[in-house]
Amino acid sequence: MTSITFISDTHNQASSLRLEPGDILCHTGDMTNFGTGPELKYFEDWFASQTQFKHKICIAGNHDKGLDYRNGKTPFKFTDSSITYLCDQAVELEGIKFYGTPWVNEYGPWAFGLHSYELYYRFGLIPDNTQVLLTHTPPKKILDYCPEQDIYIGSEELLDVVKLRPNLVCHAFGHCHEHSGRYLGAHDITFINSSNGNTQTIFL
């Protein structure tokens, strides 16, 4: 079996994590606080140093502004060959089909925010053969409750798409710091929120 370890929302604190060896390490966004070049380079160096994993995948989150190609500046590029960065892209590793997408509901001056109709388009690109889905936002009402504001911050558009993907086994995300953990949902999909250093591992 293949082990897949998930982390998210490390916000420049990734070096505080002590990760057990495994096959694939996935980071589901908000690697930084503001997405500056130095912050992203710091994360790249740390991520590349996790040589106890055979493969490493990451996607951006709303704090990772330097990766948003729409901001009028040349986006940061991960140059370390051991890192696979996904932005509306798929990759197959150890025979498992991954897809990564960073988009979130638009709010404030943050990165990768889209209106509802745009989210339906972006999430509609998720291939039917995807087995492990990496997003930054949770789907609506799945590990996305923020008690201070008494709201669910997940994406209804994402939920509508996820439940139509017939081969999906695991959906990992972050974004909501207050509700990390895992949940076995409909169609035996394992949903994982690994924000705030709450490392989660599955075996496929």
Stretches with model-predicted labels:
Residues L40-E44, T74-F76, H115-Y120, E148-L159:
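Charged helix-capping and loop-helix junction motifs
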Residues A90-E94, E157-R165, C170, H177-L204:
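Binuclear metal-dependent phosphoesterase catalytic core
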Residues H11, L17-L19, W110-N129, T135, ...:
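Active-site-proximal loop/helix segments of hydrolase catalytic cores
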Residues T2-H11, C26-T28, G95-V104, Q131-H136, ...:
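Active-site-proximal beta-strand elements of phosphoester/diester hydrolases
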Residues K77-Y121:
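Hydrophobic, well-structured mid-protein blocks that either form specific transmembrane helices
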Residues I7-L93, L164:
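Core catalytic region of metal-dependent phosphoesterases/phosphodiesterases
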Residues T32, Y107, N129-N167:
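Active-site-proximal segments of metal-dependent phosphoesterases and phosphodiesterases across multiple
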